[in-house]
Amino acid sequence: MVVVLLAALTFYLIHVARSEELKARWRYVVSSGASLCSLSLLCFFLLLSVVDSVHFRPVIDVQDGRAIYDVKAYSLLDKALGKASSAEEKSYSMPLATQTFEKISRFEDGKPVRDYEPLKAGGAHLKARADWAEDVIIKSASGLGAGLALSALLWFLTVGLISRSKGRSFKEEVRTLFKRRDEVPYEAILTTCSVLIVLGCLIGALWPYYHVMGTDQTGNDVLYQAFKSVRTALVIGTLATLTTLPFAVVLGICAGFFKGWVDDLIQYLYTTLSSIPSVLLIAASVLMIQVFIDSHPGMYATGIERADLRLFMLSIIIGLTGWATLARLLRAETLKISQLDYIQAARAFGLGPFKIMKRHVLPNVIHIILIVAVLD
């Protein structure tokens, strides 16, 4: 699904490149430093989602010339994170800790003792617990140093390429960059990328030896779970919104424009949907999907394929049942717009209702659609 969204984004960029009007609008967007910072972060999360969407099953053995694959499927993100993706503890632990958060009971010399248990992947390389502070400081300093060096290299190369493309000297380009005289504030992108690089190097220096953000109740690494949740959040948010918009826009505008029995019918429909408890509906739908998966075990061989199907159907269900709020807002705005003079003039000139809704109503409710879509 993430790959499909990425392909759709690519086609949209090609469409923007061919349209002067869209290019002018996007030039206005990228002239803001805050917009470019947000765009850089979105690209980073999209990259994480794409890397986490490429799944494969490694070959564990070869018998009679046939490859035997592992039952468990992995993603490129799992392989990139390496040890962090497989390290599991028993329960909670603090960030960068070397022992569990809670004491456990064990026997020493035949006597019961309650003490903290050492973590499997948290400071296991340390010879003594007293070396923890020094080790963390050294690894953090090395990570920060590497991050700052890479950030400086990024700034140097980027400024050099920009100055060469514009025919200016390096010093002049640096002066222009810091005085913010360019139409596109490249310093916003470079600053955001530098922060990500420094944080990445810092985490990369500590993560092979510690749980950077600790572990949860079941002993899983919290930072690893956060990285893995990016793809889920992107798929659910984007797919549910894309599923919601057609129903909400069409039905909401039609209810406000036609009024009468059309309005009553659409109101009855979304009032009925709103009365159904969403949690129970989602739970029932997931159970139905699970029954389908159990009835067709050959179609989904691995656990990750079954999880992806459940995630996809869950997003569709949320989208199909979550359009009522936006439809109400669009209905109310359309009721107001339909009484304005330019709508009456369009009717007087013989323009059909659907053309009026497309040309005159929809452009005036786009702001509501954008706000609700972003908040959802």
What name fits each language-model region?
Residues 1-244:
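Gly/Trp-centered helix-boundary motif
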Residues 34, 158-159, 189-199, 215-376:
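Alpha-helical transmembrane segments of integral membrane proteins
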